[in-house]
Amino acid sequence: MSSWVALNIEPDEAIEEEVDDTKEIQIEEALKLYQNALKLHSQGPQFYAQAAEAYEALLSSDIFKYPESISDFKRSALQDSEAHLDDDVAVIDAVETFPEFSVNDSTSSTLLQTIYLSYKNHGQFTLDTLQAFLQENPRTSDKAQEILSQVSKRTHAALASFAEALERDDTDLNLWRRSARLSNALQSYRLVRYCLESVLADDENCLEVRTDQLGLDETFAQGQLRETLQALDDNLSVSQVPLKKPKKALLRFLERQKDPYPYLPALPSHVRDEDPSKNPLAIRASCYQLTPASHTWAAVGDSILQALIDMERDASKFGPGTSIRFSMPESTADLRSSTAGEVADQDQSSHMENGESANHIPEEDVDIANTTESAAPKTLRKDQDASSILEHVDDQSSIDQRAEKQLMESLENQSARQNDATTVQDVPNVDEVEPNPSSAGRKRPSASAANEDYQAEPVRTKSRRTRLRDSIAETSLQSDEVSFDQNKYYEDRLQTYVEADEWMFDTVGPLLSKLGVDKLESLDELRRQSAANCSKSSVERSSNQPTSAVHVLYRDLDSIVKTWDEAKSQAMLQDDTSLTFQDMKAMDNSGLTIFLEHSRKSARKTGLKPSFTDDKVLSKFLKGVNEEWLHLHEVGFAWLKLLLMPVYGKSPVRKNSRSKKWPVMESAYVAFQWPDVLKEKVVQLLVRDDEYIFRKMREQAEQTELQILNHTPQTPFKYTRDHLAYLEMTQTVFEIHLDVYASINNPHSEVDQDTRLVQRDRLMRWSMLARTALSHYLDHGPSRKDSQNSIILRHIWASTFHSNMEPDVHREHILLCLQDLKEMLHRLSILEIHLMNNAMMPELSADAIDQEISKLNSMDFFMKIFTPGSEDPVELIETIEPIVEPSSVEIPEESESNDQSLSQSMVQLKEMRSFLDRGDAMLKLFLWQRLRDAYQAIDYPPKVVSCYLRSVETIIQELLGASYLEESNEHREIALIRWLKSLDRILMKLVTLVLQQSDKAYECLDMEHLRSSMSALTTLTNLLHSFALYEDSVRVGQTPSSSVRGSLSKSLGNFTEKLREMEVRCWILQYTLLKEAITQNGDLFESPLEDRILFLRSVHNALGIRKMCKRSNKQFLKLMKAEFFSLESKEAYESEICQILWDLYGINLSPPGRFLFEHECPPEKLDRSTAIKLVDFVLKLAKRMNIKDLSKSELKSTIEKIQQAIGTTKSSPPLTYNKRILSAYLKSPINPTEIFRAVRGVADLPLVPVPTESAVIAQNGWYFLLGHAALTKFRSQKRLNPVPTTDLDEAITFFRQDLDHATGRWESWYRLAQTYDSKLEEDITWSADKINNNRTELVTWQRNAIHCYAMAVATAIRSAEPTPETRATLSELYTDFGIRLYSSSREPLSMAAFSLADFTRHYSNEESQRMYQGKPFKEMRLYSVWNLARYLLKRATIDKPKSWMNHYMLSKCLWKMFSCDDSVRGNAQRISVDDLLDSLLDAIDTLPQRKDSRSDPIFEPHYKLVSIVHKLVDRGTLTPAEGSQTLMATPLARKVQPPEDKAGWKPYILEVLRRLKHADKSNWHHRMAVRAAHVTYDDTRDTVSAAAAKNELTQQIFTKTMTIQVWRPEFERPGRHFVYTTRYVYFFVSLLDQLNDRANLDQLLRRVRKKQGDFINHTKLWEDVCLTYAKVIRRAGSINEGHEENVFKPIGWEEFVANTARLENLPQLAPGSQVLLELLRDAIELKKLNNNLMKVSLLEDLIADLYSRLYEINMPQVLEQANEENKEKMKVDHLLMASDGAADTPTPPNSAPASEAPAPRGRTKGIARRDVQKRAETIVGRKLTPRAPAAKASVPAESEPPATSEPAAPSGNQPNKTSFEMGQQSDIPQSIQDSADDESELSEIDDEKLSKLAAERKLLFPNLRDRISPDPDSEMSVPASIDGDAADEVGDGDADLNEAEGGGETTVEEGEGEDGEEGDEADLERDENDGDEESLEEGEGNGEDTENAQDMEDEAEEPEVIEGDPPKENASEPEPMET
C-alpha cells in the first residue's frame, strides 16, 4: 500500500521501525500450552484426559505449522511427492519455501527447543497412559486381545513422538535408549540395534565411548547392545562394542533402572526363540485380499481377473507364498450390512500409488482358520499351528510400514480430507449384475461419475428397508389424517387423456378393420397392461403375466424405462445394428465373411436353459479359499473348474468306474445360461491366464497318459469320472476359444492381426489337447457311452467349424463333414444339444446342420450380393427381389424344354428362401437395404418405399418371433432398444420420402402389401402408445418418474424422445397407407373424405394434449395442413385449421370466443407459399368481424405476420403500367366535367389485367384488408398530440397496390380517399404552419382525395351490390365526398385544390399562329362546388335519413348558396329560405339522444340555427316573430320571451346566446360568445358597445393576460380553429383600438408574436396589429407622422450632437417628458419584439417622432444650459490666451466629459435615422429605470432586460441602485405597465444573462464606468440595440415553448365542425380578404396549443424571438437608417 507524506510536516527521526513479533508471540503461546500440558501430566492419571486435550492443543498450535518445524525426513518426503500434490497449493508452497534458519538465532533455538520438548513429553505421556490402562485392566483371557492391541498401538505412537523429538535433538542419549526399549517391545531387532548404536556412535558413526567416565545411558546401552547382538548371533559386531564398564557394584545397584518400561513386552533372549510371525526380519507369506463388488460369480471372477492384472503390473505384491483371501460375507443377506464398510475400505485404499488395485490390502500376518471340506483342492499345507498364529493377530505389524505411515502423515491428512468429501452412495443391489465389471477396479462407468455431480453434500443415505419403513409410516399417517380415494383422484386427472384416446381408437379401429387390419389393441387392454406394469404390487404384477408376444413387448419397454442403467445407455449410444450395413462399401471384406456373420439367428434361447444363479456353491468356494492357502493362479483355476467341470467339479458318490452306464453329468456351462458379464469374465480369465491353465490341463492329460502307459493286466487303468470331468473342461475351453476366435475374426472386428494370430495358435493348442483327452475317453472310458455321447458330438462339431475357419479348406470338405455330422446325429439319436453360452455353436441339431449346408450352397449367390464390387442395380434387383419378395416372381409359360431348368431355378430360389427364414433378421434387413439401394440408383421411389416398409415388417416379425421371446429379460431389453433404434432410423427416412413423393409413393403397393405394412405399423403403434400411457401416469403423479441422473438421465431422455417421435411417424405412415387403401377400396367407405379428416383430427387431439405435435419436425402438422387446405370447403373445420396454424406457426386465427389448446409447439417461420394459401381463409375470418374490432384483435397481428411472409410485390410490365396510369390520374388537375361525369358513374381508368400471383390475392381483397385495417387503426385512436402518420402511409401503399392490380374495387377508392383526408386533417389540425408555409402539400392531399372520391362514386354506381351494408357504405361515401368538397371551398383551404395556376400550358392560336399560355379547362366555380356538395349530401340522406351530420352539412351548403352574391351564384336559381331552415330543423330533429346527464350535448345545429335566423332577421328576410318562432325548434330558446318588434330582437337573441353558452358547461364552444359580442357591437359601434363587446369576449375568449382561449369542439372541421383565432384577434384589436386600451393591446401583441402556428397569415396579422399599436402610441403622445422632419431638419449635426448630449445630462426634464419617455420605450421594445418580421421603417418612424417631440419640449432648458456654459467660458478666456492647441469649438464647462463627446465628422451632414435611434435608446436607458420582474412565486419571474448597460447617475438626483432593485412603476394611468400581471415583455432577458453581460463588459472595458459616449458614430456610444448583440441574446430561443397560448384543445373525435363564415358580419367580412396571397417573410410557429386556460392567466410571460424568424446579418452592427 502506497503511503504519502505531507510536505509541510517534518518527519520524526525518532520513529523506530516496526518489528514483526508474531512468531515470538506464537512461541510464547505455545510455551504456555506446554506448561499447562506438563502440569496436568504431572498430576496423575485422574488428569490424563485433560492432559490429552492439552497436548492435542499444543501439537496443533501454530509453531508446528512453520516450515522450519517440519523434520528433515518429512521435508524430503514432501519434496519427493510434490508431483502428486498439485492440487494442494498450501503444501506445495510450504515445500518450496522452506527457509534456512540459524540455530544461533534466539527465536529459532527457542522454537526448536519447544518442539523437541513437546514431542518428548508427549511420547512419555502416551506411555504413562498405557501404564495406567494396564493397571486398570488386568490380563484376562477375554481381554487379552484388546490389551495386546492397545500395547502395540500406544507403543507405536510413543515411538513416533520420540522419533520427532530426536529429529530436533539427536544428542539426547536417554531418549535413544528409551526408543530402543520401545523398539524391543515392538519386536524389532533392527530398530533396537539402531537406537542402541546411536547412543554409542560418534560423529563418524563408529562405536566408542566418548567420555572417560561412562554415563548411565552409555553403560546401559553398551550392555543391551551386546545382548542384542548375541541374540542375533552377530559375533563380529559384538567384538566392536566397547568393553569399558563401570564397577560391578554400581551396575548391580543400577540394575533396577535398566529397564525404563518394565510393563512392556520384550524380545526373547535368542532370535531362534522368536515367534516367526512377529519377526520383521523373517521371510513370511503375505495375503492378497480380494473384495468382489457383489456376491455373484461374475464379480468374484472380476476380482480374480483384476488381481492377475495387478500381478502383471507389479509382481512385488505377490511374494513367495502369497495367498488369496476374499473379503466377502458368507451369505447374500449379510452383504448389505457390510457393504458400507467395504466402500469405506475401498475409499481409503483408493489413494495408493502406482495403480494399485482397490481391493489390495497387503498383510504380513493373516488369520486362516482350520480348513474344512471344500470344493477347492487342497494343494498347499501349513506346517505351523494355526493357534499360534492366531495368538498374535493384530499385535504386530511391520515397523517399516508404520514408520512410512508416520513420515507420510501429511499426505494422508490430505487424502483424509478428500475422503471426507466423498459422497456415500447407495450400495448396489447384489441381485443386479454389474454391466461392465471388467473395468470396475480401474475406471468407473460414465453414469456413476455423472451421478456424483448431483450429490451436493456428503449424506449418509438410509438403507432401502429403512426408507420403505419410513414411507409406509408416512403413508399410514397421511391416511389417518386425510382419507380420499387415490384411484379416483388419478382417474380424474387421467380423464382428459382417456377421452382423447377413446376418440382416437374408436375412430381409427373401425377404419382399419374395414381393411382387414385387426392388430390395433383395444384401449381397455392397453390401459390394463399399463396399469399392471405400473403397479407397485408384485402380486398384482405376477397375476398379470403377458398372454401374447405384444404384451411381452409392452412389459419389456416399461421395464427399460423404469430400470434404465449403464448397459441400456450404452446400447442407446451405440449405433444400431442395421446402421453397420452403411459402411459395407467402404470396408475391404469378402462377401463370405459378411455373409457368415449374419447368416444365423440369435443363439440365445432363454427358455431352454435356466439362468445361472447358484450362490450357495459360490459361498462355499469363497469360504474354502479363505480357509486354504492358495496362490492366485490356483484360485482362478479352481473358479473355472467350478464353472466348466460337471457338477461343479465334484465326483459323484458312486465311484465305480466299471459301471456300464454313467449318470448324465453336466457342467454349469452346459446346464445353465450365463449372464453376459459372467461369460465375459470367463473368457478374459481363460485368455489372460491361459499359460497356467493350459499347463495344468496338459499335466493332467500327461498324467492320465502316463497312467495308461504304466498300467498292467494286474493293475488295469481305471478311467474315472475325474478324468471325464477334465475332458469336459478341456472341451469347453476349446469351444470357448473357438467362439472367441470367431468373434475377433469377423469383418467388423477391430482386433489387430497379432492378437488374432495369438488366439489362433491358442485355439490350435486347445484343439489338440481336447482331441487327446477325447481319445483317452474313447479308448478307456466306460463300455456304454450313451450318456456321454454329447461330448463326442460336441468335439466333432467344434472341429468341423474350426476347420471351416481356415482359409485353405475347400467347401466340399466342409459339406462332407456336415453330412457326416448329420448322420452321426441320427445314429446317436441325439435330437439337439444346446450350448447357450457359445455364440459360435449355440445349437447342435440336424436343423442347424441343414442351415449350414444351405448357407454353403448359397455362398456364391450371397457373395455376389455382399461383395462391395457388385454395383449393377438392375442385376441386384433381378437377383434379390425374387428371394425377398416371392410375389414378384411370375413363372412364364414356356416349352417343355425349359421345364427342367425352370424347376432347377425354382428349387434354388426355394432353398434360398428357406435359408433366409432360418437365418438372422439382420440378413433379411441387409437384403432389403441392398434392394432399396438398387431402386434408389434407378430412381424409382415407390419401390424404395416398399423396401422400407418391408424392413419395418421384418423387424416387427423378429420382435414377435420365438428368437426374441425366448431370450432373458436383460437380453430382450437390450435387443428391443437396438431394434427400436433401427425402426426410428427407417421411419425417419420413410416418412420424409412418403411426404415428398406423396403422389406416387404407394403406386406399386397392392392391397396385400398395404395390409401387411399397416398391420406391422399398428403393432408398433400399440407398443409406442403403451409408453404414452406410462408417461400419462407419470405426468399426473400416479407413477414415479425415473430417478436416474447425469449421463444416464440424458441417454434415457434421448431414448424416450425417440419413442415419441416414432409414434408420431407411425401415425403419419398409418394415415398415408389408409389414404391409399381407401383409394384402392373406395367401395368399403361411405364417406372417405370425412373418414380421413376424422382420423387426422382424433390423432391430432390425442397427440396434442400430450404435447407431441412438435415431434418429428412437425411433419404430422404439416401433413394435416396440406390435407385441410386441399379441401374445397373449410367452414366445418375452421377450429381445427386454426389449431393447426397455431401449432405450426404460432399465429392465432381463432375468432373471439373460440379457445385454442396450447400444445407447446415452437413456432416456425411462415413461408411465402403457405402465407398465400392462408389468404382466402384469413379473409373469410376477417369479413365476419367489424373492421374496428379487427384492428384490436389478435387476428390483426396474424395478418401482419402473413403479409410479412408474403413480402413486397414483384414488379411486372402490366403492374408498372397501371401504376403510371394511377399516379397520372391522382396528379391531374380537377376537371369539373370529369367530376360531374364521375358522379353520374361514367368515369374510369384504362388499367390492364395483371397476370401474377399477387393479382390473385389482390382480387380476393388482401391488400384492401391490410389498407383498411391500417386506416382504421389510425382513425380509431384518440390523439392528444400530433402522431406519426406511418399507418396512413401503409394504408395508402396497400390501397394503391390493390388498385394497381386492376381490381376495380370501388371501396378501395373510397378508403384511399379517406386516407388522404386523414393525412390532410392531421396536417392542419394541430398547427397552422402548413397552411401558412406549405400549402402545396395540402393541395395535393385535397386533390388526391377528391379524385379518389370521384372514382369511388363512379365505380360504385357501376359495380356496387345493392345490399344494405353496401348502401350504408355508399351513404358514408357521399357524406365524406360532400364534406370534402365543402371544406376545400372554405377557409383555410379556400378553393386551392380547384386552382389551375400550376397547370397552365402553352397553346398555339389558330388565327394568329402564335403561342400563348392558358389553362387546360375552366376552373370549377365556388358555387358549383357548393352545389355538387349539396347534391352528394342529399344522396347520402336517402340511405341515412337519421344522420344529423348530413342535414347539418347540407344546411351549411344551402346557407352559402343562399347568402352568396349574384356574381358568385351566376345564373343558378336562388335557394329558398324554407329549404334552408328545413335542413337545419332536420339536423336538430335527428340529433342523437344524450347517453346520460354527464355527456355534452351537440350544439352545432342549435347554434347554426340561431346564427342564421339572426342574420335573416337582421337582413329583413324574416320578421322577429318568424325568427323567434323558428328558434322554438331549439329547446334553449323556448323559455325566452319572444320579441314583439325589431327593437326587442337584440335582447332576445342575446338571451338565447346566453342560454347556449350556459348550456356549454365545458366551455368548448366559443362561437356563441363571439356572436354575442358582434350582436352587441355591430349595430352602434360606439365606445360603450365596444366596451360591452370587449367584456363579452374577455369572459371566455381572452383572459386578463390576453391569452386566447379557443378550444376545438368535437365536430369542428380541421383547420377552422385557426380561422376563428385569426378573426377573433382582428375583432378584439379593433375594440382595443377604439377603447384606446394600450396595456391590453401590448399583451395581446406579445401573444400574437409568440404563437405563429395559431393564426392564418400570421405575418399579415402581426403587421396589422403592430400598425394599430403604433397608432395607439401616437394617439397617447399626440404625435403626428413626420414630426421628426419639422424638428431636426433645421439644425445641423454639431448642434444635434451637442444638444442631445445636454438633453441626456439634464437633471430635470420638462413636464410631460415622462409620458414621452414611456411611449418611447414601448416603441423601442416593439421594434425589438418585431425582430424583422415586418419592415422596421414604420417602427423607426414612430421612434424618431417620439424622440423629436421629447427633444422639442426640452429645448428651452437645453438652450438655457448652453448659455450658462458660454458665460462660464467667457470668464476663463483670459486664462487660456497663452495656451497652445486650443479647441476650435469652445466647450462649455458643464458639458459632458471629453471621452463621451463624439468625434467630429470631418464634413457637415444631415442627421441620420440611426443617430436618432441611438439617442432615443440612450436617453430611455438613462432617464427610465428598467421594469422590475413580476414577483410571483408560482411561476418564474419574468424580467425585462435593459436595452443598454447600467446608466450613469446623471447628477446625483437618481438613486445609486440598479434598475432591478428599484422596480419603479410609471405613474401614467394608461401606461403599458398597467397590465394584469404588472410586467412588460418587449425586451426581457434573464437576470443571469444580464449579470453575465455586465460582467463581460466590465472585464473587456474595465475603465468604462456606466457612461456612454455621445459620439453617434462610435459603436460603443450606446449599447447594442435589438439589432445588435442584445438582439442575439434575446433571440437565443423560445423561453416559453411549452406554454400553449391562444390555441385550443384540438384533440377531438372524428367528425366535422362549425363553419365560421358569417355572411353579413360587416367588419369581419371586410377584414377577411385574400391575405394568404401575400408572400411575406414568415417564421415557423411553435404550434403549441392551450392546455389550461386558468394556468395561462396566472403564468408570467417571457418575451422571445420566434424560432424561424429570418436572422439578421451583422447583428453586432447598428442598423443603418435612411435619412
From Swiss-Prot:
Q: Does the keyword 4Fe-4S apply?
A: no
- Stretch list, region Disordered: 319-467, 1780-2019
Task: Identify the keywords attached in UniProt to this record, alphabetized.
Answer: Chromosome partition, Nucleus, Transcription, Transcription regulation
Which segments show compositional bias classed as Basic and acidic residues?
380-407, 1808-1817, 1888-1910
List where Low complexity composition bias occurs. Answer: 1826-1851, 1864-1874
> Keyword Mitochondrion on this protein?
no
Provide ranges: composition bias, Polar residues: 334-347, 411-426, 1852-1863
Name of the protein described by the UniProt record? Histone transcription regulator 3 homolog
Which species? Answer: Aspergillus fumigatus (strain ATCC MYA-4609 / CBS 101355 / FGSC A1100 / Af293)
Origin organism lineage: Eukaryota, Fungi, Dikarya, Ascomycota, Pezizomycotina
Gene assigned in the entry = hir3
